[in-house]
Curated annotation (Swiss-Prot):
InterPro entries for this protein: bL21-like, bL21-like_sf, Ribosomal_bL21, Ribosomal_bL21_CS
PROSITE patterns cross-referenced by the UniProt entry: RIBOSOMAL_L21 (PS01169)
Record flagged with keyword Signal: no
Domain of life: Bacteria
Cystine crosslinks: none
Role according to the record: This protein binds to 23S rRNA in the presence of protein L20.
GO MF annotations, alphabetized: rRNA binding; structural constituent of ribosome
Name assigned to this protein: Large ribosomal subunit protein bL21
Record Pfam families: Ribosomal_L21p (PF00829)
Tagged with keyword Amino-acid biosynthesis: no
Swiss-Prot/TrEMBL keywords: Ribonucleoprotein, Ribosomal protein, RNA-binding, rRNA-binding
């Protein structure tokens, strides 16, 4: 059984027990959260139910494992003959979650 959830402006196909890296969520580590924006869910008999746009009465429970930062992205601007150089770095924060249960 799987579900398609939406979080952080992206969509993820998840199963129970999956470990997922999503955009940063403002919850402490170890807390159990619930995703309620469910786009689709498969039933035990193989049928798939789709929402318009989201399904009612379906939730996905997940536990927050850790928070972190992704690899450093370096942005370099350069204009020739003008002595213009700008270097900037960025590390995108993320949250790692483990899917515990798909509740229907």
């Amino acid at each position: 059984m799987y579900a398609i959830i939406e979080t952080g402006g992206k969509q993820y196909m998840v199963r129970e027990g999956d470990v997922l890296v999503v955009e940063k969520l403002n919850y402490p580590e170890g807390e159990v959260i619930s995703f309620d924006k469910i786009l689709a869910v498969s039933k035990e008999d193989g049928n798939v139910e789709f929402g318009k746009p989201y399904l009612e009465n379906v939730k996905v429970n997940a536990k927050i494992i850790e928070h972190g930062k992704g690899p450093k992205i370096r942005v370099f601007k350069y204009k020739p003959k003008k002595n213009y150089r700008r270097r900037q770095g960025h590390r995108q924060p993320y949250t790692k979650v483990q899917i515990e249960k798909i509740v229907q």
